[in-house]
Amino acid sequence: MNRRNPDVDASRSAIQSNTTINWISLLLIAGALLMQNAPLRADPSPTPLTIVAFGDSLTAGYMLQPSQSFPAQLQMALEAKGHKVSIVNAGGSGDTTSGGLDRLAWTLQPVPDAIILELGANDALRGIDPAKARSNLDSMLTTLKASNIPVLLAGMKAPNNWGAEYVATFDAIYPDLAAKHGVALYPFFMDGVALNAKLTLPDGLHPTAEGIAEIVKRILPDVEALVQKAQATKAAAKN
């Protein structure tokens, strides 16, 4: 019968233990070297900002292909400038400020990062009391402010056929409310396009695809400022 030598067994255990420790050390060193030499991974792409274009047929793209609408052309213009954005088309043809107020709450689900508010053209065309349009827009801006959503308010101008008093009262709505709520104002959404037969449809009211392109070109700096504000607001909310 073979007897085990305790001293030999102890030596073997020590050798095995030291060997295991040495292998672990080598693996740790090798891993550290690999980490040092490994290329740095780029940060994941930021989630695109969601901007809702909330308006009437001027926003929706009346008689245009979806790709020719204001939201679609605006998104392409912003992406060309390097902005990661998703512009949601929340335009409703025929909408007045009353219609916009009625659907604002569900349009804000989920809450967007910013909104372009373009309403009032149909109020002016129908001769709706400017006080009503003012009240509706005021309520919408109050809701957006309470939700901490950055806003670009796109102004409208009343047609002259309603008389000078109506025009003055209506046109004052947008700068007044922009100042009251501390939001950015683009004075006239149809700037450079209204009354231009080359940039409007035969109805003389709605922009063609080329008309939309002109609107986008003119409003783009203001929307870029809105994007920056939305980014800052989003970053502050995370802290």
Model-derived regions: residue spans:
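Short histidine/acidic/glycine/proline-rich micro-motifs that form metal-
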Residues: 58-61, 65, 91-95, 122-124, ...
